[in-house]
Design a protein with these regions (language model features):
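N-terminal chloroplast transit peptides
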Residues: 2-14
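Long, positively charged leader/targeting segments at protein N-termini
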Residues: 2-3, 38-186, 191-194, 222-668
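Membrane-entry segments of alpha-helical transmembrane domains in multi-pass membrane proteins
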Residues: 165-167, 209-213
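Flexible phosphate/Mg2+-sensing switch loops adjacent to catalytic phosphate-binding sites
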Residues: 188, 195-211, 553
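E2/UBC-UEV (E2-variant) core
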Residues: 204-208, 217-220, 400
Length: 668
């Protein structure tokens, strides 16, 4: 039996199989809480980020030293250490400065990108490049995997055209058949980084200790530079470049302006540039970094590559004793492409290996897919580098809040609190019908309540029981309340659609151009996907409004909640996944703020298996460092005073929209 995942957002990936005794489901940190959705984000540690810990100046080597290194292409670059360090310091200072004022984020991005391009130009030809193509190293990868205890029977690596490389069945494989396993010793993990040449620096640097994804990125770079590395067959098989927004040209990023995803894209670039500058200085000045192979060559392109490699591939696995989770790169398994379905991979602690069962029946020569999780297309584009056209989990986010200056604020906040909903919150509009979750339905109902209705839900008969009906579409507060909330949704969606610089029709026309670059196509697809969700929300709001207006005009009786109707609360049409409003199910679906231990499930069986998601963002940051590593720009939630005020200004939204599949990253 396959175990369906509760939710996955920014992780590609996998959860448990039916033979599991214990299935642990993990979620990523999300923008709704303290940790941002940007990969590898950290803010200025006082006295650290602007100037990494350093040894005396004498340990930096001769100031007249000149670096020259040839790449695989034969190009070379000559630049003095002092000149490079000045540029790096300028970049670090720019990226560590206070967040720009609203509307100035693009200007800041241009400035940061300009500095990065100066650095890249001076570093041209200094990056490590393997000869040949990645395809040349696939046979070596398969042999290495087999020699080290992985299963290699039943599939091979093949090119699937627009989807890129993936796993191809070499025999018939049945659904739920265990066809792939990877032992721990093959994985690149935070623990293996601690036991490597990076260990000394790790033990002394707080950022590495707090952010496993950063550690994994530097671990990958150090091993790539080591010709005797155990993981070299795996590293050589990785793409030489990616299609994450870190690789977009400026004009390609510009196509995302006005979308709800653009802020995450800009933050991702800024954070990556800041981290590169910080670690460049650290590698050059810290005594514990003196033996790192990065000391002689550590380019921005190198770091961008390692960040993208980790961001598109990392996953959480249990430590050897099973007491906690750690981050890992999983060779061979990460060749699987994504499709809709269920999580079918887990970690078997007894055999100490990752195990993957078939999502469905596969015939010989068919591509073998896995399900990366319930990610939005914005998450796929930003963290995986592809757009998934048939994404049944696509959504955009909308920030809503009850204005504290509103006369009824205290009453509304109290009703919402009893329902487990904050007075200001990030919600999601979904691509499917209905477009709103039970939590959002409950919020809008409370938001639109009159004073008498609020009193009824606070002090009236069966007030406690009524709270349970707030997220259930079967039990309206009143016809007037339903009309108000659906009018609000209709108006809000219409206003948000007006913020885009292009229409859906114009986007579709642009996508027909044959000379469109891959990244431009993905950006436009993501932009269009956001609009389509808003258009569906508008249409749904209008249809619902008209329906309830008709009921009101006809004098239809209002359905009343009875205790005998409890079954309806567990099978509501409002959202099959989100039935009871007291559960913060919107957070579960979007991966926002859910602690890992809340995803622990006990199943019948004998083995211990951890279910996992392939992460795109990294592991949670410890509480004591969260404030220090949350230097991203987050728009304040909209404070909405009344229905009239709502229609006069737009809601400040941050959504994860999506775009279409990226041939490279979908396959890699």
């Amino acid at each position: 039996m396959l175990i369906s995942a509760l939710h996955v957002t920014d992780f590609a990936g996998f959860r448990g199989v039916g033979s599991a005794a214990h299935l642990w489901l993990f979620s990523k940190p999300h923008v709704h809480q303290c940790v941002t959705s940007d990969f590898l984000n950290f803010a200025s540690f006082p006295g650290v980020i602007t100037q990494p810990p350093s040894c005396p100046a004498s340990t930096m080597g001769k100031k007249s030293r000149v670096k020259t290194q040839k790449s695989g292409s034969g190009a070379s670059a000559v630049v003095s250490p002092k000149e490079m360090m000045n540029l790096i310091s300028e970049l670090l200072q720019k990226c560590s400065s206070a967040a720009p004022s609203a509307g100035k984020e693009w200007e800041e991005y241009i400035q940061i990108r300009g500095l990065v391009e100066k650095i890249r130009k001076k570093q041209k030809g200094m990056s490590v490049v393997f000869e040949g193509t990645r395809e040349d190293y696939f046979p070596e990868l398969m042999s290495w995997a087999q020699e080290n205890g992985a299963s290699c029977d039943g599939f091979t690596i093949a090119n699937f055209g627009s989807e890129g490389f993936g796993l191809q069945a070499t025999r018939d494989i049945k659904a739920e058949e265990l066809f792939l396993w990877i032992p721990r010793k093959m994985l690149m993990t935070v623990e293996s980084a601690q036991n490597s040449v990076l260990g000394s620096l790790y033990s002394q640097d707080r950022i590495l200790q707090a952010m496993g994804n950063v550690t994994l990125a530097l671990h990958l770079l150090c091993e790539r530079a080591n010709s005797a590395s155990f993981w070299l067959p795996y590293i050589r098989s990785l793409p030489q470049e990616y299609d994450t927004p870190l690789y977009y040209q400026q004009e390609e990023v510009q196509l995302l302006l006005g979308t709800q995803a653009v802020q995450d894209v800009l933050n991702q670039y800024k954070n990556t540039a800041r981290q590169y500058a910080y670690f460049y200085k650290l590698v050059q000045t810290h005594p514990a970094a003196s033996k790192l192979p990065l000391k002689d060559s550590f380019t921005f392109d190198d770091y961008r590559w390692s960040v993208s490699s980790v961001m598109t591939r990392q996953n959480q696995i249990p430590t050897e004793d099973g007491s906690r989770v750690t981050l890992a790169l999983i060779p061979l398994w990460d060749m699987c492409n994504h499709t809709n379905g269920l999580i079918t991979t887990g970690y078997n602690l007894e055999d100490d290996r990752c195990e993957c069962v078939a999502l469905q029946d596969y015939k010989e020569n068919e591509q073998i897919y896995i399900f990366y999780g319930t990610r939005s297309n914005a998450e796929f584009v930003i963290h995986n580098g592809f757009f998934f056209q048939d994404n049944s989990h696509d959504r955009v986010k909308i920030k809503l809040g009850v204005s504290k200056s509103e006369r009824l604020y205290a009453m509304k906040a109290e009703v919402l609190a009893r329902a487990g909903i904050p007075a200001s919150c990030v919600f999601a509009l979904h691509c499917n019908e209905p477009p709103i979750s039970a939590q959002l339905l409950a919020f809008l109902r409370v938001f639109c309540m009159t004073e008498e209705e609020l009193k009824d839900y606070l002090l009236g008969d069966h007030a406690i029981n009524k709270i349970f009906t707030l997220g259930n579409s079967e039990f309206p507060v009143s016809w007037e309340n339903e009309i108000k909330l659906w009018t609000f949704l209709e108006t809000r969606a219409a206003l948000l659609l007006k913020t885009y610089k292009t229409t859906s029709e114009e986007d579709r026309s642009m996508l027909e151009k044959p000379d469109l670059s891959l990244h431009s196509r993905v950006a436009i697809q993501l932009r269009l996907a956001e609009k389509q969700i808003l258009e569906k929300a508008w249409a749904s709001g209008r249809a619902k409004r008209l329906n309830f207006q008709k009921k009101q005009e006809e004098g239809a009786p209002l359905p009343r909640y009875e205790e005998s109707d409890i079954a309806l609360l567990e099978n509501t049409n409002a959202d099959a996944k989100l039935p009871i409003i007291l559960r913060k199910l919107e957070e579960v679906e979007d991966g926002q703020g859910i602690q890992m231990d809340e995803h622990t499930h006990l199943l019948n069986g004998e083995k211990v298996v951890y279910g996992m998601d392939m992460e795109a963002n990294g592991e949670p940051v410890h509480n004591e460092t969260q404030e220090k590593v949350s230097k991203d720009i987050q728009s304040p939630s909209d404070s909405i005073g009344s229905l009239n005020q709502k229609s006069q200004r737009e809601v400040s939204d941050i959504s994860d929209g999506r775009t279409e599949e990226n041939p490279k990253e979908n396959s890699e």
